[in-house]
Design a protein with these regions (language model features):
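Acidic, metal-binding active-site segment of PIN/NYN-like and related structure-specific nucleases
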Residues: 59, 67-85
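Non-catalytic interface/targeting segments
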Residues: 1-33, 37-41, 52, 89, ...
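Conserved BB-loop
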Residues: 45-59
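Hydrophobic beta-strand scaffold residues
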Residues: 46, 73, 94-95
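Ligand-binding "clamshell"
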Residues: 86-92
Length: 150
């Protein structure tokens, strides 16, 4: 009798092999060295806002540039409607960490915990999209008409 083929314990599309296909851009609100270093340690390519733009650059000005490079935007801003439209019009992809008042290490832990889900979305969802990363590392794509209550 033939031996049973061992089943993979990793769900299809959720391993980290595709991580090197993407460049993650940490915007000015999330440009922590702890996040950068944690993502790089996992094999990600990471760029930081401060290395490409002035500190006071308006989001609507740099968003199309980053989307045009096909970099994945990481932020903790819940973009206003003009910024969300700029992402969508430029066919951008953005993940927003929606939990405030966290240290860089805590943010890094949440984002790294969400990477498999983020990669699943990146590999299977065409741009443009905006997704939220929650404190539990759960990731949820926001509907196009989403408007946060403020």
């Amino acid at each position: 009798m033939a031996a049973k083929k061992k089943k993979s314990t990793t769900r299809s599309g959720t391993n980290l092999e595709s991580l090197n296909l993407y460049t993650f851009f940490l915007d000015r609100a999330l440009q922590s060295y702890a996040i950068r270093d944690a993502l790089k340690a996992m094999g990600a390519r990471v760029e930081m806002h401060r290395d490409h733009f002035k500190e006071d650059a308006d989001d609507v000005d740099w968003l199309p540039t980053i989307a045009g490079k096909e970099w994945v935007i990481l932020s903790k801003d819940q973009f206003n409607w003009m910024e969300r439209e700029a992402i969508r019009n430029a066919h951008g992809r953005a993940f927003l960490l929606v939990q405030g008042s966290l240290t860089g290490r805590e943010q890094a832990s949440i984002i790294c915990g969400a990477l498999r889900h983020m990669l699943r979305i990146l590999n299977n969802t065409p741009a443009p999209f905006i997704a939220k990363i929650h404190r539990t590392s759960h990731v949820l794509i926001m509907p196009k008409e989403y408007r946060p209550n403020r």
